[in-house]
């Protein structure tokens, strides 16, 4: 299996005794700050979180996932060695859409923010897997609580856990507790050649 195809599988448990290392951390930071975006504008801020206490507080606010027994559980993907939070951001020079009303402007900027976050997080995902790490995306969190923990009023677009897998467990086993996440079937992307 190639690193690319392997990188589409999420990790839910982590080996916290290992350290990502400064070189890989810097590579992830470079990807986050240099990924392409519309008009090369900064549509997001990133929070690079290694503070275990803060990561666990965020984890406590990620309820929204149901395990195989139908019990709501926190999302263990955020318990990785490094947690990245993507915060919506608008710099003054983003406001070049001056001919739009507020609703049109908000729709365009939100689209561009999400596209930029998708590209940047994709870069991180691939870099992580190329360096022996795994990743886990999270979008099921209590927004107001996570914003308060990160001390921001801006929307948190997505969370991305990056770290070493716990090789003593299956990737769908919980990091904390003894439950198993419901595995999802692989996606099938239709490709049209012309």
Annotate the PLM regions:
Residues 1-93, 192-194:
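N-terminal amphipathic, basic helical "cap/leader" segment at the start of enzyme domains
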Residues 2-21, 157-194:
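C-terminal helix-cap and adjacent tail motif
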Residues 32-33, 84, 104-147:
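Small-aliphatic-rich amphipathic alpha-helix that forms the alpha element of a beta-alpha
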Residues 41-44, 130-134, 157:
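Short secondary-structure junction motifs
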Residues 78-79, 95, 168-173:
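Short, charged, surface-exposed secondary-structure boundary motifs
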Residues 88, 140, 162-164:
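Short secondary-structure boundary segments
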Residues 93-102:
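Short, flexible, mixed-charge acidic loops at enzyme active sites
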Residues 151-157:
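Short low-complexity, flexible loop/linker segments enriched in glycine and/or proline
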